[in-house]
Amino acid sequence: MTPTPLDLYNRKVEQGSLQADPHQKEALATLDTLFQRLFSGQPRDGFLKKLISRISGEDIRGIYLYGDVGRGKTMVMDLFVEAIPADTALRRVHFHAFMRDVHDYLHAHPKKGIIGLVKTISKQTDILAFDEFHVGDVADAMILQRLFSALIDKGLIVITTSNYPPQRLYEGGLQRQRFLPFIDLIEQTMEVIELSGPVDYRARELGCKNTYFSPLNGENK
């Protein structure tokens, strides 16, 4: 039986490589539900067709995991990625790198545009996993609305982490009103999970290391 993301988490806790955290475990329970729906022991041939047929008529097409820095969002997502069977067409990428690839494609193939990009991605990918989803300018905002709408229509599963809840994406941005339908799309088609908790694991890890500041002035003392 294929171990689920929560199985992997519990194993790492037992081995002492992770500290048990109820907030992380709660988020992983939701990821487990999606994982088991996708990989419930069905034959692995023709995965994408099976995936589309299994999610037809269902609203949830992915997970949007957000929360403060250092709460373990990336670790939780990576456990989901680690559990996915090796023959699945998976792409795990930092969101900034993904958007750089998007702009490169659109620049190189102006006639194909978003439609061509969607065809290319959907042929190569069943599941997209993004780390640190963020929208910084109006060009990206407009591209994302069209791109993600089309990818979700194609049946792709999207897993992403972000420091911001959907309603705060592109907050205060130019022409943000035109971006609001994309926020609606996220909330309608993805399970939105807040990973909260009082522990900042990133700060704790840095605190265990020797850290040096330069220049040595009053501000850094």
Name each model feature, range by range.
Residues 73:
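Conserved lysine of the Walker
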Residues 92-125:
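Short glycine-rich substrate-engagement loop in P-loop NTPases that contacts/grips substrate
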Residues 82-90:
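Post-Walker A helix-loop "phosphate-sensing" segment adjacent to the P-loop in P-loop NTPases
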Residues 18-51:
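N-terminal pre-Walker A segment at the start of P-loop NTPase domains
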Residues 70:
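Walker A (P-loop) phosphate-binding loop of P-loop NTPases
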Residues 76, 80, 94:
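Hydrophobic positions on the alpha1 helix immediately C-terminal to the Walker A/P-loop
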Residues 47-65:
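Pre-Walker A (Motif I) flank of P-loop NTPase domains
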